[in-house]
Amino acid sequence: MAAAAVVVPAEWIKNWEKSGRGEFLHLCRILSENKSHDSSTYRDFQQALYELSYHVIKGNLKHEQASSVLNDISEFREDMPSILADVFCILDIETNCLEEKSKRDYFTQLVLACLYLVSDTVLKERLDPETLESLGLIKQSQQFNQKSVKIKTKLFYKQQKFNLLREENEGYAKLIAELGQDLSGNITSDLILENIKSLIGCFNLDPNRVLDVILEVFECRPEHDDFFISLLESYMSMCEPQTLCHILGFKFKFYQEPSGETPSSLYRVAAVLLQFNLIDLDDLYVHLLPADNCIMDEYKREIVEAKQIVRKLTMVVLSSEKLDERDKEKDKDDEKVEKPPDNQKLGLLEALLKVGDWQHAQNIMDQMPPYYAASHKLIALAICKLIHITVEPLYRRVGVPKGAKGSPVSALQNKRAPKQVESFEDLRRDVFNMFCYLGPHLSHDPILFAKVVRIGKSFMKEFQSDGSKQEDKEKTEVILSCLLSITDQVLLPSLSLMDCNACMSEELWGMFKTFPYQHRYRLYGQWKNETYNGHPLLVKVKAQTIDRAKYIMKRLTKENVKPSGRQIGKLSHSNPTILFDYILSQIQKYDNLITPVVDSLKYLTSLNYDVLAYCIIEALANPEKERMKHDDTTISSWLQSLASFCGAVFRKYPIDLAGLLQYVANQLKAGKSFDLLILKEVVQKMAGIEITEEMTMEQLEAMTGGEQLKAEGGYFGQIRNTKKSSQRLKDALLDHDLALPLCLLMAQQRNGVIFQEGGEKHLKLVGKLYDQCHDTLVQFGGFLASNLSTEDYIKRVPSIDVLCNEFHTPHDAAFFLSRPMYAHHISSKYDELKKSEKGSKQQHKVHKYITSCEMVMAPVHEAVVSLHVSKVWDDISPQFYATFWSLTMYDLAVPHTSYEREVNKLKVQMKAIDDNQEMPPNKKKKEKERCTALQDKLLEEEKKQMEHVQRVLQRLKLEKDNWLLAKSTKNETITKFLQLCIFPRCIFSAIDAVYCARFVELVHQQKTPNFSTLLCYDRVFSDIIYTVASCTENEASRYGRFLCCMLETVTRWHSDRATYEKECGNYPGFLTILRATGFDGGNKADQLDYENFRHVVHKWHYKLTKASVHCLETGEYTHIRNILIVLTKILPWYPKVLNLGQALERRVNKICQEEKEKRPDLYALAMGYSGQLKSRKSHMIPENEFHHKDPPPRNAVASVQNGPGGGTSSSSIGNASKSDESGAEETDKSRERSQCGTKAVNKASSTTPKGNSSNGNSGSNSNKAVKENDKEKVKEKEKEKKEKTPATTPEARALGKDSKEKPKEERPNKEDKARETKERTPKSDKEKEKFKKEEKAKDEKFKTTVPIVESKSTQEREREKEPSRERDVAKEMKSKENVKGGEKTPVSGSLKSPVPRSDISEPDREQKRRKIDSHPSPSHSSTVKDSLIDLKDSSAKLYINHNPPPLSKSKEREMDKKDLDKSRERSREREKKDEKDRKERKRDHSNNDREVPPDITKRRKEENGTMGVSKHKSESPCESQYPNEKDKEKNKSKSSGKEKSSSDSFKSEKMDKISSGGKKESRHDKEKIEKKEKRDSSGGKEEKKHHKSSDKHR
């Protein structure tokens, strides 16, 4: 009805009179145009009539309307009555079934209304007799039925009898004699036929009986086929065609009794008659038993039985009795299979196959379920025999092995049999088709199996070597496709049914190895996942294989590997896919099975090894398995077990690696890096290249030598017997062009792990995947570098610019891949030059080496320019960049110690061999020879490396002058060097970490122009927080190694004055005043002296401590883990200072307590480090031993300036300075003034005794003391708004414990002190009194300490290096400072209390910010670290500590009074101006605060708040940050104590941070700054006058 609704819509019926009738007529007219009975329009026409009639039956349309429209339609088609009768017939049946009276009545009315359209005769043919009776077409239906039966019986069933009485036996006797005579003479079938005709006529014989007799004789004389076929053909021309078939069918029926057995002769006669088309197969087929539906039932029953057997076999526990029962059942089943019931269809099929009638045989098999016929052994063997005969000529030509004779197969004499094949093309005709019907039952004929495989192997050789035309190629591709199908459907299933035939397996591999792995793996996949489910026999075999595999695996141990291995081998010959699938599932669950399983696989065939590779890949790619554990932080153990098994099995056995490598590559293409674990294991096991972060320093040192030293001393395990396996791995990579793609994919995937994969994954897992990806890249690259020949490597790896720009390879990875290529190139060029000019002089050799380097590296220098923006090359040259990235540790130094160690080991071995009395002499001699050869190799390698290193150093010596261009500041140069060279490479590998440290030292030793060693080390050590936080676990380990090597160098210089003087004394890297561009004068006064260097080293140690404590305090997993790893690595050289070590120890112990239950891995790391730290405690020294704390001599003065942009970080390294503008007389005066100023400050700040007088800024501070008193309240209000609670961070608390006995004036402010006292336990009264006394003593001591030296202004020195466009600004700044008074004398506190951050005036900060913004901010995190702000604040400052003789108390009081009176007058006048200044500053700060995200601001506040406390604890003179020249306006007096100091310090530090981020200022800010500068200059003039008047007074 659904289809009918499409033809006649319901709307037509509803609107029948209006439009429906017309629409229906129109539709019928269209459908009547095609008169054919086969077309779809004819069916639609029928459907339309049916639909119309059905609407009448349902009552939707009146029968008159229907009969009217049907009358109109009858004109359209002549066959309208017949169609309408068919429709009525269908409706008659439907309405009869419905049993609804109303519908039946409607139907009757419709038919009666249409009687004039359809004749009575037609209706009587097609309608039911009861319907005819109801319509009145017949009187009684019963009579009608009886009459029709009588007529049919008379027509079809009445027998025509022969007159048997007239037939005589003599006639039949003569007939048999005629047919049984000797037919070898000239007797022909025509002659015999004439005699038979005579006998029939003479003896009145029945022709049918004669035909039956002829068939009987034919059955008994099969050798005379041709005669009887000819006779029957002639005889049948006189009979009805059906007669012969009926007689034959009657014969078959005779044998269909329960115990009857059809003779084979009868099958043969029927087969021959079918072959010569004397009878039709369809006519005969109906006479044969069993029926097709019985065959189908039998087939289904076999499948059910097979599944029941599977269920029985998979039962978990069976007793021995049940096992016996099961064996008996198996025997019964076998018996059943051996005795099949008599099946006439199969008997005929066998006969057809024997006579070679393939066409009819095929027709019979098509009637049966797939492979049902072939599952009977006789049929299978018959098909096999037919194939043997058919392929014989081709096999003789291409398949017979050399030297083999073989037994030829005779061809069928039957001309109608399939033609024999002469070429591969002929196989398509019938042979492939025969195999398809044979299926898995080729297992019955192993000889034919081998023949087919050999023919296939020959075809594949021809196919692969064929260079013929396109047409021939297309034909051969079709044959290949057929061959693959036969392999899938016949060969592999047949192998499964063969009983462990290893020879067939090896024979099959001979053909399989010619297929590409894609074809092979597809075949294995079909074999494993589909083949076993399609055949009842294979279902059983699969269950039996799994059952047997379980039995073997349960008993497999290390002790019984051999016998179990043999059983595994035997089982694998036939069903490898099922066996390996089960074995791998067990390995994934129990990793202790890996070793015994690997050892037990030695008895497999080549085909089985290949199947194993496929099964491993399939197990790896299993989508149902989770690759992560439930905690989402670690890789699943099943994947780790499979990876380990992969590495072991691929190393031990000759398995094709192509598929596995391609799988890993495909996974990387898909952005999945889990499976890199497989590649890592395979390379490690097959090539012996280990990647581990736990290498000892001895191993690391050995890795810097040659290949022999690496193999002997660079790895944990001795690398043995990897030559063959590494060669196999190399061949697989090169043959399938996977070497470079894998490298590039890994290099790209490193970032993919973070940005694509890492979104939903746990950070810990992302880090592990990144490390795995990176480590595998390093390992794989190392394998390629050591195993590929120079030609192979150079041919595959493109140039550096192509790698980076086209393949988007990260620069570090690109250079890592290119580095061996450069070394190969240079080496080959050098050898060429040596051969061409045979000069033995060393100098000539060096010259040739340098020439070869220039030839190879010149294109590289050009290529690297495109890697970075042009501005980069203003700081460092492309040559320097390429040199850094192209060299390795092998080029820089010879590991003599390592060579010596390995040689000594060999000597010890040789001595042990000599002492061994049990060893046979032959073996002893052999071992000694091996050790001697190895020793000679090592010594030769060492010598070779020494010569190479000498050549490299000579080359570097010549190159160094062009390395660093003096186009920008040294600070920018160092930034680019660290950003583009050191930091990317130091975390690439452990050996690269050592290389980076040694390279920095080498650049220093070479006295490279424009390279500041001091700046470089300072930038590395100053703040490691962000670097450490952004590392993965392994990167942290490498970064730790890098810092360790850097600290080693620094410690060597620090520990001995002579070493320092020798290696650093007169080196440009340790200049502290960096003069005009390109000038590195050797002025001794510009060099950093030994004592000041020790101060700097202490500062670096302090910075490391501060960063470490910060990371430990964060609570972040990554921060804590990474800093603990780094600290563990640098333990040999840090901490050296006792108080820093104690601070670290306390924090680490706290981590141990906190993480014990929460994060066990952090707890383990912390405990490990804590234990090692305690063991190093005895080597730590007090601070005063680490660096000399007394004031150093004046001539050790130093300052570092960076020229233009000098506002960026530069270290305040010296403590003393030369005075450029004042003589001795001015110095004395300024000393007196600053002393008075200090006294005034101390008096004025009597209300706040906890203030730190060391923040005194200049001699004029005394004049501003009163003003500061008045301003104190305003400042406090500002401070409350800015920071309601003082920022104290955990590291401040950690370090604070070291300095409990420091005087109160060291506290940053009252709130800080209050917080610190809360954290401590309450003190007793005695302790408080003692504390007050100590404070008083310190106050008095402090009053005597005043600095007396004047500093060269920052702007003045900047002008020396500044470009002309910046000089106007510099002049303006200098003039302002001169007006303010150049006699600025920075005051230093006592050595015990270094001053916190200096306060910088607002215009000064803005000016600095402009200058900083003119230079790009380095991308590496160290350049934005907060601790570097200390360096920025202190740029271009000069410090000295000096103790003048104390004045008498009465004089002090007088001078203080006068100064205070005058300062009060001045302060009132300027109070209003300052109030405005403060408001503007406050507004500026709030604007800047908005620019910084709140979380960053908060963190910076905490860090800055800490600095106030932590700097007191450092006790290092280098840490004292002194005010700049422009600080007089803000720091007129420090009488307001530490509150003001810490507040201003916080502000200035925040401003510096913002400026270091490189943000641009608005025009509005610039206008404000200009206004402030004007006000400050006017204020400076007044100050100058005030200074003069105070001088006169004195």
Swiss-Prot record:
Residues 687-1174 are annotated as: Stern domain. It holds the Pfam family THOC2_N. Residues 535-686 are annotated as: MIF4G domain. Residues 1183-1594 are annotated as: Disordered. One of its GO terms (biological process) is cell morphogenesis. GO terms for cellular component: chromosome, telomeric region; cytoplasm; nuclear speck; nucleus; THO complex part of transcription export complex. Residues 1183-1192, 1218-1234, 1265-1285, 1294-1343, 1353-1383, 1449-1504, 1524-1583 have a biased composition (Basic and acidic residues). The modification Phosphothreonine is found at residue 1385. Residues 164-534 are annotated as: Bow domain. Residues 1175-1594 are annotated as: Charged domain. Expressed in the hippocampus and the cortical neurons. It is found in: Nucleus; Nucleus speckle; Cytoplasm. Keywords: Coiled coil, Cytoplasm, mRNA processing, mRNA splicing, mRNA transport, Nucleus, Phosphoprotein, RNA-binding, Transport. Residues 1251-1264 have a biased composition (Low complexity). The keyword Metal-binding does not apply. Residues 896-965, 1464-1491 form a coiled coil. Residues 1416-1425 have a biased composition (Polar residues). A motif (Nuclear localization signal) lies at residues 923-928. Component of the THO subcomplex, which is composed of THOC1, THOC2, THOC3, THOC5, THOC6 and THOC7. The THO subcomplex interacts with DDX39B to form the THO-DDX39B complex which multimerizes into a 28-subunit tetrameric assembly. Component of the transcription/export (TREX) complex at least composed of ALYREF/THOC4, DDX39B, SARNP/CIP29, CHTOP and the THO subcomplex; in the complex interacts with THOC1, THOC3, THOC5, THOC7 and DDX39B. TREX seems to have a dynamic structure involving ATP-dependent remodeling. Interacts with POLDIP3. Interacts with ZC3H11A. Belongs to the THOC2 family. This is THO complex subunit 2. It comes from Mus musculus (Mouse). The lineage of its organism: Eukaryota, Metazoa, Chordata, Craniata, Vertebrata.
